[in-house]
Amino acid sequence: MGSIGEPNRLLCWSIYVTKKPDQSEEDHHNHVSKVNAPMMIPFLKKYGIVRYTVKHNDAHSKPKQAALMAGQPEENVLAYDTVFEMIVKDIESIQTMQKDEEFLRTTIPDHFNFADMTRSKGSLTWIEEFTF
C-alpha cells in the first residue's frame, strides 16, 4: 500500500463530474446509475477496488448545500453534479484497470455520454475514518 515506511491505509480516488451542457439533470443521474455504474462494477471487482461510491448533487441537494455554505463566496461551493469515489489499497489497481482493453473500449467512451470531460477533476487522498 505505498512506499516503504508509508502506513497501511486505504486511498480514495475521487472524480468530480459536471453533466454535459445539453443533458438534463435527470438524464445525467439516470445514465450514471443505470448505465455507467453497472458497466463499471465488473472492472471494479476484477481489479480489487474495495468500494465504489457515486454521490449525486441535484435540485434536491443543491439548496441544502447552499444553506450549509451560507455566507460563503459562491466560488467556495463546489458545483459538480456527481462525485465518483473508488476506495483502493493502492493506485496500481486503478492503473491496471485503466490499461484493460475492454475497459478502454467500453467504459471510457461512455463517460462522454454523461460528463463534460473538459470540466472533470480528480483528487487522490488517504482515508482516516472515525467510527462512532
Swiss-Prot record:
Pfam families: EthD
Family under the similarity heading: Belongs to the tpcK family.
Function text: Dehydratase; part of the gene cluster that mediates the biosynthesis of cercosporin, a light-activated, non-host-selective toxin. The perylenequinone chromophore of cercosporin absorbs light energy to attain an electronically-activated triplet state and produces active oxygen species such as the hydroxyl radical, superoxide, hydrogen peroxide or singlet oxygen upon reaction with oxygen molecules. These reactive oxygen species cause damage to various cellular components including lipids, proteins and nucleic acids.
Gene Ontology molecular function: monooxygenase activity
Name the UniProt record assigns to this protein: Dehydratase CTB10
Signal peptide: none
Gene: CTB10
Swiss-Prot/TrEMBL keywords: Monooxygenase, Oxidoreductase
EC number: 1.-.-.-
Gene disruption phenotype: Abolishes the production of cercosporin but accumulates a red, cercosporin-like metabolite called precercosporin.
Metabolic or biological pathway, per its Swiss-Prot or TrEMBL entry: Mycotoxin biosynthesis
Coiled coil: none
Every EthD domain range: 21-117
